[in-house]
Amino acid sequence: MKRFKKVVVGGTFDRLHLGHKALLRKAFEVGKIVYIGLTSDEMVKEKPYAEKILPYERRLKDLIEFLEVNNFKGYRIIKINNAIGFTTEIRSLEAIVVSEETYKGALIVNRAREEVGLKPLEIIVIPIIKSKLGCKISSSLIRAGLIDPFGNPMKPRS
């Protein structure tokens, strides 16, 4: 039995890597229905190596493919334009799944929910997934060509 009826998770999900997959797996482990906030192209313009971020439609396609391959059911993907997204509009959300790195974002979401009279979400935190180099696996490092989506160091181009 799932702990929560409705949980939320959000991100850019650019070049789906082990960290993204762990986050999504945890959300489906604890939630019956998972609301996934997927950042718009507009929202990612300030990220490192923004020019290399895949377009929204491609990220959406890759995300759906991952969900289907893993046979995850009961999800809604919603485009978001800011860190709060739809979390103040869906009253019945119960929990938010974040990484250690994005925990502060969950606090911002809860503050916004409280400001509009909604119950704060229970925060579920997963550990950061490390690369073989010892640093966290991140889309920024993948876009920079330093690691692959599995955390393996990229071989220098000769």
Curated annotation (Swiss-Prot):
PANTHER family per the UniProt record, alphabetical: BIFUNCTIONAL COENZYME A SYNTHASE-RELATED, DEPHOSPHO-COA KINASE-RELATED
- What HAMAP family does the annotation carry? PPAT_arch (MF_00647)
Q: Which GO terms describe its cellular component?
A: cytoplasm
Recorded protein name is: Phosphopantetheine adenylyltransferase
Q: Which GO terms describe its molecular function?
A: ATP binding; dephospho-CoA kinase activity; pantetheine-phosphate adenylyltransferase activity
| Name of the encoding gene | coaD
Q: Which reaction does it catalyse?
A: (R)-4'-phosphopantetheine + ATP + H(+) = 3'-dephospho-CoA + diphosphate
Give the Pfam families listed for this entry.
CTP_transf_like
Instruction: State the pathway, as annotated in the record.
Output: Cofactor biosynthesis; coenzyme A biosynthesis
**The keyword Cytoplasm is assigned to this record:** yes
Q: Which GO terms describe its biological process?
A: coenzyme A biosynthetic process
Compartments in which it is found: Cytoplasm
Q: What does this protein do?
A: Reversibly transfers an adenylyl group from ATP to 4'-phosphopantetheine, yielding dephospho-CoA (dPCoA) and pyrophosphate.
Task: Give the record's keywords alphabetically.
Answer: ATP-binding, Coenzyme A biosynthesis, Cytoplasm, Nucleotide-binding, Nucleotidyltransferase, Transferase
Alphabetical list of InterPro entries matching this protein: CoaD_Thcocales, Cyt_trans-like, PPAT_arch, Rossmann-like_a/b/a_fold
